[in-house]
Each structure stands twice: as structure tokens, then as C-alpha cells.
Design a protein with these regions (language model features):
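Domain-level signal for soluble alpha/beta catalytic cores
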Residues: 1-178
């Protein structure tokens, strides 16, 4: 595998994203059915060689918790988790960075943070909130390089390498480690 050929220590993260369903009472997904789905994914990722499990782009803390419960049923791999924050600040389910940090810390995750988002400033704002409650837990930032748009046959992101480099430096300076 590519990780074995890297010539340096490499961790392979098995990614699991949101189900696309809403938890009861707003939707039909139960915590148990959600956990079952994530257990199956975690088992496959672990047997495929993932060193850690990465639950990402979540908007609901209840779904995130069910995903963690499910993943822990079938794997002892460390778990990192990130949430997606929206234009007004919280996730689409109303979760703030502070709320996310508290719940993710309570779940005993190996690393916590934010990913995706509509723009870098929103992601940075959420990450600063997460940092304030993270304690010694490593914090992750994985922002989009802007909102993608089609130009002809190409999908283009507005964030240049310079914009992304400045973003990364701000986050490192703030205390982000992943």
C-alpha cells in the first residue's frame, strides 16, 4: 500500500460521513439503526487496514454519538470526529463549536474539530470555539478551499494556495494540531 511505501510514518484514516437521514423525532432513524450502520462501516474500514476511524461532516450530535457507539462495537481503532458548520455559525442542526467540543470530549474521541463549511472564516470561527473547550485533545481543521463552482467542464474552488496557506498558518497559530 502507498502508506507502506511513504518512507515516513503514515496513518490511514477510514472516513465515515453522515447518513443523510434525520434522527427521531424529526426523522425516522433511531440511534440503534444509526449505530448499526456505522458499526458495519467501521468493521469494513478496520479490516481494510485503516489505522483510525474519522467520522466527518456531521451536523447532529445525536448522529455523531450513534456513529461513535457503532464504531466502537466493531473496532478498537482511535476515532476522530469533525462537524460541518454553516454560514450563521452553528451546524444545520444548531450545534455551536462549544456544544460540539463538550460532547465530543465526553465521547472520549482521539481528536475533534471542523471540516467543510461554506467558507474559511466560518470554519475558523467554529474551530476557535472548539479549541476553547478541547483541553488536551488534538483539534482538527479541514476547511474547503471556498465554495466550488462549475466553469465550463471544470469544478473550481475560489481558495488559492496562498489563501489556504494563510488559513493553515492562522489555525496552527491558534493551536490546531491536525
Amino acid at each position: 500500500a502507498a502508506a507502506d511505501e511513504a518512507g515516513r510514518p503514515v496513518l490511514v484514516a477510514g472516513s465515515m460521513g453522515p447518513s443523510g437521514e434525520l434522527m427521531e423525532p424529526m426523522g425516522t432513524m433511531t440511534p440503534d439503526s444509526c449505530a448499526d450502520a456505522f458499526a458495519s462501516q467501521a468493521e469494513g474500514l478496520a479490516s481494510g487496514g485503516a489505522d483510525l476511524l474519522w467520522i466527518e461532516t456531521m451536523s447532529s450530535l445525536d448522529e455523531l454519538e450513534a456513529a461513535v457507539v457503532g464504531a466502537r462495537r466493531t473496532s478498537e481503532r482511535p476515532i476522530a470526529a469533525t462537524m460541518r458548520f454553516e454560514t450563521a455559525g452553528p451546524t444545520m442542526m444548531g450545534v455551536t463549536g462549544e456544544d460540539a467540543a463538550r460532547r465530543m470530549i465526553d465521547l472520549g474521541l482521539a481528536a475533534i474539530g471542523a471540516n467543510c463549511g461554506n467558507n474559511i472564516a466560518e470554519t475558523e470561527s467554529a474551530v476557535v470555539q472548539i479549541l476553547s473547550g478541547a483541553g488536551d485533545t488534538p483539534v482538527i481543521v479541514k476547511a474547503n478551499a471556498g465554495v466550488p463552482e462549475f466553469r465550463g467542464d471544470s469544478l473550481i474552488y475560489s481558495g488559492s494556495p496562498e489563501v489556504m496557506g494563510a488559513h493553515v498558518q492562522r489555525m496552527v497559530d491558534a493551536g490546531v494540531s491536525i
